[in-house]
Regions:
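C-terminal helix/juxtamembrane-tail motif
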Residues: 1-5, 480, 497-518
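Conserved cytochrome P450 K-helix E-x-x-R motif and the immediately C-terminal K′/meander segment
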Residues: 49-71, 264, 357-398, 403-405, ...
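Cytochrome P450 heme-thiolate monooxygenase catalytic core
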Residues: 107-115, 149-326, 342, 357-360
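Cytochrome P450 heme-thiolate "Cys pocket" and heme-binding signature region
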Residues: 312, 397, 434-468, 493-494
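Cytochrome P450 heme-binding "Cys pocket" and the immediately downstream C-terminal segment
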Residues: 337-339, 461-500
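Conserved cytochrome P450 K-helix/beta-meander segment immediately N-terminal to the heme-binding cysteine loop
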Residues: 409-439
């Protein structure tokens, strides 16, 4: 019998053979120098991708089960990339203190290349001079105490207006029992996008008094939704680079299209800001950036790219993160009605029913703050945090971690450590009034780091907490909340870049205050 080969046959065979040799050497290299244990179940070429990147099991749960078997520090292989998985707050503390500089960089994912202006987008930028300059600008001009106070009117006015619109919607659409069914994921999303886009670009896209183009508003919402979906996917090129040319699933093509659409929208904003720049007034962050970076070049990025990428990074992160947090907080309250009732009692005691909640009231709402902390413990915006990459060899728990290893901190596991948290799976805000009353979420208590820790900690923590407390307090004060037939809320998670609730959050609302207060 004769065998014939196509012209490409030998070359493809050679490529696979070379890759297999590389794979075996890579594994052998990883076994030296007292390497951490590697989880079982790895396959040639793909490593543990079949366990982590597909199927019905969520990655944080699978990795948590691996930690039960292999311990709080172990490695997996995502294609050709060795990845360290840490499931202990003590090890997280060592990483973000002793080895903080070494773990402050990001892997270069395809999404960051095509949708993040070739890694110019702040959230995805590698650690270095460019990242430090942009972070300093953001910290001073947008998220400092002074800046947050100057922008307070945006948070307050948007929250008040959203409550008014919600009341008017109830008044027009309420049923015979005086209730209105509202899908709160969308409502929270509109509110938070209005706040962050007003702060960044001076536009209000959603609601009855929106001042932006409705078509542009829908495009903006869609492109951000596509961004988060695509950025949260396992892409072949990120794990097995030599197969990237196949573009399995067409994800790279979609990323390029989404990146172009995002750029088209924000380029329009930038041109509008340039046209009004001669007035000398600075009303939003894009105005500030125009004067701060015009005529400069950081790491070969032109000023326009720096402005657009930074603004998009803040809009995507700020809007989605707070929305996710609010959705889970309300979901937990509806599944724990006694906690909801206690929160409303606290509001009635400190604010009463003759006025609305002010931002200055939040400091007095101790139980509400405990609810927020407990929600962030159980449902941080990302169960696996943001991926890091070691930029130098390190020694952790007596194990040698080579440069180039990727890092995952399993917050889902560390935040449920029974050695730290009594009844760790239960929603108990009271723990932050007693045993854990001195804990905060700003990266100092490594048992609770929903925003990350170290140099790469989320720069918008204070903004997120301001929004989370203000919106939640106003909603609980202004409306009674329940579910159809008093059913429990489905708590299924939709895994991705952030942990959004997989199903709608349908809530029955009715006013608690006099109509003159809306």
């Amino acid at each position: 019998m004769d065998f014939t080969f196509s012209k490409t046959g030998p070359s493809i065979t050679a490529i696979f053979a070379l890759f297999f040799i590389f794979y075996l050497r890579f594994r052998s290299k990883g076994s030296k120098n007292n390497a951490p244990p590697e989880a079982g179940g790895s396959w040639p070429f793909i490593g543990h991708l079949h366990l982590i990147g597909g199927g019905s099991r969520l990655p944080h749960i699978t990795l948590g089960e691996m930690a039960d078997k292999y311990g709080p520090i172990f490695t997996i292989r995502l294609g050709v990339h060795r990845t360290l998985v840490v499931s202990s707050w003590e090890l997280a503390k060592e990483l973000f203190t002793t080895w903080d500089v070494a773990v402050s960089s990001r892997p270069k994912f395809l999404a960051a290349k095509h949708m993040g202006y070739n890694f110019a987008m702040f959230a995805f930028s590698p650690y270095g001079a460019y990242w430090r300059e942009i972070r300093k600008l953001i910290a001073v001009e947008l998220f400092s105490i002074r800046s947050l106070e100057l922008l307070k009117h945006v948070r307050v006015s948007e929250t008040e207006l959203s409550m008014k619109e919600l009341y008017e919607y109830w008044n027009a659409k309420k049923d015979g029992s005086g209730q209105l069914l509202v899908e709160m994921k969308q409502w929270f999303g509109y509110l938070n996008l209005n706040v962050i886009i007003r702060m960044i670009a001076g536009k209000r896209y959603f609601g009855t008094t929106a001042d932006g183009d409705k078509i542009e508003a829908r495009q903006c919402q869609k492109v951000l939704r596509d961004f988060f979906h695509l950025a949260g996917l396992f892409v072949v090129a990120d794990t097995i680079p030599f197969l990237g040319w196949l573009d399995v699933g067409g994800y790279e093509k979609r990323m390029k299209e989404t990146g172009k659409e995002m750029d088209r929208i924000v380029e329009k904003w930038l041109e509008e800001h340039k046209q009004k720049a001669n007035s000398g007034s600075k009303h939003d962050f894009m105005d500030v950036m125009l004067s701060a970076v015009e005529g400069t070049a950081l790491q070969d990025y032109d000023p326009g790219t720096i402005i657009k990428s930074t603004c998009l990074s803040l809009i995507a992160g700020g809007g989605d993160t707070v929305t996710v947090m609010l959705v889970w907080t309300v979901s937990l309250l509806l599944n724990n009605r006694h906690v909801l009732k206690k929160a409303q009692q606290e509001l009635d005691i400190h604010i009463g029913k003759e006025r609305r909640v002010k931002e200055s009231d939040i400091d007095k709402l101790i139980y509400l703050q405990a609810i927020v902390k407990e929600t962030l413990r159980l449902y941080p915006a990302g169960f696996l945090g943001s991926p890091r990459e070691f930029t130098e060899d390190c020694k952790l728990a007596d194990y040698h971690i080579p440069k180039g290893t990727r890092l995952i901190i399993n917050l889902w596991k560390t935040h449920r450590d029974p050695q730290v948290w009594f009844d760790p799976l239960e929603f108990r805000p009271e723990r932050f009034l007693t045993t854990h009353k001195d804990f905060d979420v700003k990266g100092q208590n490594f048992e609770l780091i929903p925003f990350g820790a170290g140099r790469r900690i989320c720069p918008g923590i204070s903004f997120s907490l301001h929004m989370l407390h203000l919106v939640l307090a106003n909603l609980l004060h202004a409306f009674e909340l329940s579910t159809p037939s008093h059913e429990s809320v489905n708590m299924t998670v939709n895994a991705g870049l952030t942990n959004m609730k997989a199903t709608p959050l349908d809530v029955l609302l009715s006013p608690r205050l006099s109509r003159t207060l809306y």
